[in-house]
């Protein structure tokens, strides 16, 4: 970074500090004014109580003149002042500008508990109600073209938080079927972030690591005397530490059959006992299992899914996939799953939306380097067309955007062609992506 850039950065920081100091002065003045109002309210209440005690003492001693003077003079005057002071506090509270409160309420406690623990409070506040009502539209912002999956997951969460779900079982349990790259993992990640304000609330376990019988015990912990006993189970320990989470079991069809015995207990009772004898509560988790069962069948049916008989073809495909699933998974396990959801292959229209989502992520990364990215509609369309591969979903698109935008932008930064506060235009010329400094 050269001297001019350093000087400009220093000026920007000084302006920001000056702005923050001005904001601090305003907030401090407001805080002092509110503090004075609350202090006045307390003082007047104390004076009122003292005068009432005095009036009672004079009444017992028979001095009714003093009683009348206090009750109909001084007390009335202080009550009027207290009412006026309370009116000012209520006016600030109604406008939403109140910083301080004389008394804390249930909402304040709920907010602090949620902030400290990351656990949503049992009594739904108005803000949480709005958040839950908007869950479907929020999930649609990041997961494209999977309406049935988004609706099913949203309904399960709403049932649970409204108190209408089964209290003895997890919030929801789902099997996601579908080809690779269509949003199965992305939906789980988005759900964890939206519900618990933290992507780390997603507990992801790759079931291909549990293909052998001797590996199954690692889910609940090694038995006493075996290596790894002190570490706890990979599933139970993760949920014990984060009881409010989304549990993603990737590629469930690869797991050893004994794994389903463990999962059966979770789906039935909402709890599991680890190797140390501790009972782990799964009642506040969402269990999502993904599977690539029938991926080849889906690819072979692709041409029918985009035709006029798309709905009929999709219904037939679902039935075939369910039959394949029955061959891999025991009936008693499937009966305890809330829903088996088919993720449909992405269309060209879906990919256009995904291009915008992916580009916004690249744009945000560049913004942190103080570089602005702008892209034309033609370039977005070209990326969607080039990255479209029905067999592999959105993953080829991510590679195309990395190759065409991220890699080339990195080279421009390293070569000194682009620096802080610059704008880079991304367009299309001669059927190729071009990047120019504005």
UniProtKB/Swiss-Prot annotation:
It comes from Chlorobaculum tepidum (strain ATCC 49652 / DSM 12025 / NBRC 103806 / TLS) (Chlorobium tepidum). This is Probable chaperone protein ClpB 1. GO terms for molecular function: ATP binding; ATP hydrolysis activity. Residues 128-345 are annotated as: NBD2. One of its GO terms (cellular component) is cytoplasm. GO terms for biological process: cellular response to heat. Residues 1-118 are annotated as: Linker. Its main location: cytoplasm. Residues 346-438 are annotated as: C-terminal. Residues 1-94 form a coiled coil. SMART domains: AAA (SM00382), ClpB_D2-small (SM01086). ATP binds at residues 178-185. The gene is clpB1.
């Amino acid at each position: 970074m050269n001297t001019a850039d350093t000087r400009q950065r220093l000026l920007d920081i000084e302006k920001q500090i000056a702005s923050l100091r001005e904001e601090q002065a305003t907030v401090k003045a407001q805080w002092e004014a509110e503090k004075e109002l609350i202090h006045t309210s307390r003082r007047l209440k104390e004076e009122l109580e003292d005068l009432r005690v005095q009036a009672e003492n004079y009444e017992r001693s028979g001095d009714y003149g003093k009683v009348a003077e206090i009750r109909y003079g001084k007390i009335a005057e202080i009550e009027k002042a207290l009412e006026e002071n309370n009116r000012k506090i209520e006016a600030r509270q109604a406008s939403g500008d109140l910083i301080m409160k004389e008394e804390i309420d249930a909402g304040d406690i709920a907010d602090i508990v949620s902030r400290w623990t990351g656990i949503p409070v049992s009594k739904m506040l108005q803000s949480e109600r709005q958040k839950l009502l908007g869950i479907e539209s929020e999930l649609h912002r990041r997961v494209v073209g999977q309406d049935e999956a988004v609706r099913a997951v949203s309904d399960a969460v709403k049932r649970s938080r409204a108190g209408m779900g089964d209290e003895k079982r997890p919030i929801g349990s789902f099997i996601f079927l579908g080809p690779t790259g269509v949003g199965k993992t992305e939906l789980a990640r988005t759900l964890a972030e939206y519900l618990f304000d933290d992507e780390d609330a997603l507990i992801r376990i790759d079931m291909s690591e549990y293909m052998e019988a001797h590996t199954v015990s690692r889910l609940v912990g090694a038995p006493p005397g075996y290596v790894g006993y002190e570490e706890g189970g990979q599933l139970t320990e993760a949920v014990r530490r984060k009881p409010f989470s989304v549990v993603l079991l990737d590629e469930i069809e690869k797991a050893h059959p004994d794994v389903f015995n463990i999962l059966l207990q979770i789906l039935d009772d909402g709890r599991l006992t680890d190797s140390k004898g501790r009972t782990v509560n799964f009642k506040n988790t969402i269990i999502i299992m993904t599977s690539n069962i029938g991926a080849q069948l889906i690819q072979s049916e692709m041409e029918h899914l985009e035709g006029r008989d798309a709905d009929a073809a999709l219904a037939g495909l679902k039935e075939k996939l369910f039959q394949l699933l029955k061959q891999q998974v025991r009936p008693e396990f499937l009966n305890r799953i809330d829903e088996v959801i088919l993720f449909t292959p992405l269309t060209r229209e879906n990919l256009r939306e995904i291009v915008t989502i992916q580009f916004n992520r690249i744009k945000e990364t560049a913004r942190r380097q103080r570089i602005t990215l702008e892209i034309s509609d033609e370039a977005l369309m070209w990326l969607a067309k080039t990255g479209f591969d029905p067999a592999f979903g959105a993953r080829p698109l991510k590679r195309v955007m990395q190759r065409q935008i991220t890699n080339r932008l990195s080279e421009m930064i390293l070569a000194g062609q682009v620096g802080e506060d610059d704008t880079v235009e991304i367009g299309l010329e001669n059927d190729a992506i071009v990047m120019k400094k504005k």
